[in-house]
Amino acid sequence: MCQGIKLLSDLCKNLTIIFILNSKRMKTLTKEIQDAITPSMALQILQDGNKRFVSNLKTNRNLLQQVNETSDGQHPFAVVLSCIDSRTSAELIFDQGLGDIFSVRIAGNIINEDILGSMEFACKLAGSKIIVVLGHSKCGAVKGACDHAEMGNLTALLAKIKPSVDDEVETKDNRTSKNSDFVENVAAINVKRSIKAIMEKSAILEQMIKNREIGIIGGMHDLSTGKVSFYSETAFIS
């Protein structure tokens, strides 16, 4: 009986959090709300936000109020690794406000020590509940890797994407950026390789995932529609 009451109480609490974060007038995240969010709830919030974005139903926010309310601290529920592409702002495509998301951006959404350190800070120290590795269609960095481009410091960055090019074995001919299907296949593989790299190269994040403290998932943002599709096979979420 007591267990049933507790489950009902937890369900009501979860529904309350989801309602608060998806209401027409979004509230600024507090430590209490952040603590109550589970990894699966965090994913649902992002999915709901993207649906609003695609439907052009942006949440009404008082950004100046959020500036004031986050001036002494922040409690983001998610960390999103995405490309630097100007069309892929995580806060916009997931319809979130100030203090909601740690946005980590680098061309080609690749993984290195600095990226991992940023994620460890976001999750272990700041309390975020989910990591999203977000690729996007028509990615210039992926195209550069497909074409084996070389230019200054960009050469070393593209070298981190080239293993994804090699892993794409479906395409036999026209393995260049002119083949859009090839580019999109490589972009998807690159997201999945980044998920694997996070798990392998960060003992802190791997342990938090195993302990179900945080979740991780990969996804792809379609620049033509704005829709984000998540890869269920990459998900480690409770």
Walk through the language-model features, giving the residues of each.
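Short glycine-enriched loops at secondary-structure junctions
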Residues: 82-87, 107-110, 136
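Conserved functional hotspot residues or short segments at active or partner-binding sites
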Residues: 133
